[in-house]
Amino acid sequence: MKKLIILTCLFATLSVAASDPPEVSEKVLNAFNKTFVKATEVVWHETQNLFEASFKQSEIISRAIYDGNGNLLRTTRYYSQENLPIHILTKIQKKYAGKSIYGVTELSMDDGVSYHITLQDEKNWYVIESDSWGSLELTKKFKKA
């Protein structure tokens, strides 16, 4: 729960710090509204001719990036272990027994879906990556302060 509060605060801070909202084309808005029908708290940003929507859907904080023609390029979702595919969760629990899942970042692009999972134990933080098949790789390890 603490991780969701932190992510929500970060999301809110970034939203408040944003400048004037960009003019989002009708193509982009239509594409977004068709794909994310139940999105709430939508905030738009424009960078280098790309449009990024930050929003919540089913209580999951998400981002979607579109080009000017309304093509969805990438989505990012931030959530807890409850939304992680069960086969990946089971592999993590087996391989990293004794560590708890702090949060999940899911990246979805044309070439597939990847998961960046932050784990913790009493002494360390761990970042592991998984593909949609559940192949796990430890990418970072940090000592807690």
Identify the function of each model-found stretch:
Residues 4-14:
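Sec-dependent N-terminal signal peptides
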Residues 19-145:
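Interaction-mediating elements
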